[in-house]
Amino acid sequence: MFTRIFTKEEADALLPELRRVLKEMRQAKAELLLAQSRLPEARGVERRALEEEIRFLMGTLEADARYLASLGVLLKDLDRGLVDFPARVGGEIVFLCWQEGELEVTHYHPLSGGFAERRPLEEAATPPPKVAHPGETRPGA
C-alpha cells in the first residue's frame, strides 16, 4: 500500500528537506501563475517564450511532486504546506501529519481522515482511562 512506513523520528529528520522542496515548489507555482496571467495578451515570440516557460515550470512542479512521492511522503496541500507520512501508531496504520511552520511532527490522523481529524501524538501514547464496571473496586477506593 505504501512504499515506506515512518517513525516520528524519521519524519522529523525529513523536515529540513521538505521545507526546502516546498519553498522551491511555491516559487515555481508563483512564477507559473504569473506566466499564465501574461499569456492571453502575448503574441509571437513573447507568446512562444511564455509557453516554453509554462511547460518548464509545470515540469519542475511535477518533478518535485515525484521526488516527494519517492521519499514516501504525501503532499496534501502545497499552499498550506501539509504533508502526510504513513506511520504505525498504536498498531494501526495512520498518517503522521505535519504543517509547515511546525517545528516537528506532533499530530496524526486516520487514513480515512484529514487535517480536520488531526490528533496529538501524545494522545496515542496515553492509554485510555480504565473504567470501573459495576461490582469492581478501583485501586485506592
Predicted regions and their residues:
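Long, hydrophobic N-terminal alpha-helical segment
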Residues: M1-A42
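Low-complexity, charged, repeat-rich alpha-helical/coil interaction segments
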Residues: E9, E46-A49, V105-T106
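Active-site oxyanion-binding pockets that recognize sulfate/phosphate
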Residues: L15-L18, R47, E51
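Charged/polar positions within long, soluble alpha-helices
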Residues: A30, S37, R66-A69, V73, ...
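Heptad-repeat coiled-coil alpha-helices
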Residues: L34, R38-E41, V45-R48, S70, ...
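Short amphipathic alpha-helical coiled-coil/interface segments
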Residues: L50-A65
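Glycine-rich, aromatic-bearing surface loops/beta-hairpins
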Residues: S70-A141
